[in-house]
Curated annotation (Swiss-Prot):
Cross-referenced PANTHER family: MITOCHONDRIAL RIBOSOMAL PROTEIN L24 (PTHR12903)
Gene that produces this protein: rplX
Subunit architecture: Part of the 50S ribosomal subunit.
Entry superkingdom: Bacteria
TM ranges: none
Gene3D superfamilies: 2.30.30.30
Family: Belongs to the universal ribosomal protein uL24 family.
Entries under InterPro entries matching the protein: KOW, Rib_uL2_dom2, Ribosomal_uL24, Ribosomal_uL24_CS, Ribosomal_uL24_KOW, Translation_prot_SH3-like_sf
Biological function: One of two assembly initiator proteins, it binds directly to the 5'-end of the 23S rRNA, where it nucleates assembly of the 50S subunit. One of the proteins that surrounds the polypeptide exit tunnel on the outside of the subunit.
Protein name, as recorded: Large ribosomal subunit protein uL24
Keyword Ribosomal protein: yes
Length: 105
């Protein structure tokens, strides 16, 4: 997957369109990501050993990765990602707009 934990992303479709957030976790087998502060759902819980008191908990739910776009840390714009190899053979992610290296893969 092109998106990794800790990346800043922009939601491009759905009820939270236009919101930005940091990726909390990535679920590669399902091709989903969990973004901080986006797609918040309410979960009703019963009392158990961990939580003495039940109640309604708000937590972020996963989004399909096609609904988010990476924000380049250099040009601060949503961008697609290209992959290139450095001279020493390492594979890196590159911003399509500003051609800067985003980070090591």
């Amino acid at each position: 997957m092109d998106i990794k934990k800790g990346d800043l992303v922009l939601v491009i479709s759905g009820k939270d369109k236009g919101k930005r957030g940091k990726v909390i976790s990535v679920l590669p087998s399902e091709e989903k990501v969990i973004v901080e502060g986006v797609n918040i759902v309410k979960k009703h819980t019963r009392p158990n050993a961990k939580m003495r008191q039940g109640g309604i908990i708000e937590k972020p739910a996963p989004l399909y990765r096609c609904k988010v776009m990476l924000i380049c840390p250099h040009c601060n714009q949503p961008t697609r990602i290209k992959h290139t190899f450095l001279e020493d053979g390492r594979k890196v992610r590159v911003c399509s707009k500003c051609k800067e290296i985003i980070d090591r893969v």
